[in-house]
Amino acid sequence: MEIFPAIDLKEGRCVRLYQGEFSKETVMNEDPVAQAIIFETFGAKRLHIVDLDGAVAGESLNLSVIERICKAVRIPVQVGGGIRSLVSVEKLFSVGVDKVILGTAALYDKPFLEETVRLYKEKIIVGIDAKNGFVATRGWLDVSEISYIDLAKQMEKIGVQTIVFTDISKDGTLAGPNVEQLELLQKNVATRVIASGGIASIQDVKKLNDMNIYGVIIGKALYEKTIDLEEVLEVTKLC
């Protein structure tokens, strides 16, 4: 199982949100580059970065910070948030990003998604964020009428190999992941699934590992120290 420490960027800082609410923000580190280096120092093999400003604006607004992070660490970095054009995708790859996560564009711009998957194959990940089982977009501000399962099936047909699934109601809560929704997702698609939202303990991670979940994104639990990064990396290595 892959462990992805999370860095959420807002106005150039590393923050955490509660249930996706921009008004419920906590600054975790004023310097996200320093935070990335900390994660790498403690053994992280990869990083998950979300440009929250970009997710709302529809274009990357923290590109310079992302570039500095990519230059500061030697581990692969995957980035999502506001990536809705081929130019944005190419810019991220040009500054050293390893994989790009598409969210809103996956729902509303299928030709763009198909083209990026054709060009970059496994380097393109789709992020599916769900609220009460329905896909949320544009920085979680809009909720669609399409179920997360239906969108996942569409993504699989297009050739997407990896999906990041987030249950928004769990995000930033330390309430544990939505196991039921993850199980349903696993039953319906054969794509790799990276779980995000609510991870609070080593036990949560072990449970997801037992479900054959490909990867886990851990944010608040690392900052609040309910999960020790070195320990969880060791545990998943032994599983």
From Swiss-Prot:
A single Gene Ontology CC annotation of this entry is: cytoplasm
InterPro entries referenced in this protein's UniProt entry, alphabetically: Aldolase_TIM (IPR013785), His_biosynth (IPR006062), HisA_bact_arch (IPR006063), Isoase_HisA-like (IPR044524), Isoase_HisA-like_bact (IPR023016), RibuloseP-bd_barrel (IPR011060)
Pfam assignment, any one? His_biosynth
Catalytic site positions: D8, D129
The main place the protein resides is cytoplasm
PANTHER family the record matches: 1-(5-PHOSPHORIBOSYL)-5-[(5-PHOSPHORIBOSYLAMINO)METHYLIDENEAMINO] IMIDAZOLE-4-CARBOXAMIDE ISOMERASE
Pathway it works in: Amino-acid biosynthesis; L-histidine biosynthesis; L-histidine from 5-phospho-alpha-D-ribose 1-diphosphate: step 4/9
Entry EC number(s): 5.3.1.16
Reaction catalysis annotation: 1-(5-phospho-beta-D-ribosyl)-5-[(5-phospho-beta-D-ribosylamino)methylideneamino]imidazole-4-carboxamide = 5-[(5-phospho-1-deoxy-D-ribulos-1-ylimino)methylamino]-1-(5-phospho-beta-D-ribosyl)imidazole-4-carboxamide
- Keywords in alphabetical order: Amino-acid biosynthesis, Cytoplasm, Histidine biosynthesis, Isomerase
BP-aspect Gene Ontology terms: L-histidine biosynthetic process; L-tryptophan biosynthetic process
Q: Which GO terms describe its molecular function?
A: 1-(5-phosphoribosyl)-5-[(5-phosphoribosylamino)methylideneamino]imidazole-4-carboxamide isomerase activity
The family this protein is said to belong to: Belongs to the HisA/HisF family.
Listed name of the protein:
1-(5-phosphoribosyl)-5-[(5-phosphoribosylamino)methylideneamino] imidazole-4-carboxamide isomerase
Compartments, as annotated in UniProt: Cytoplasm
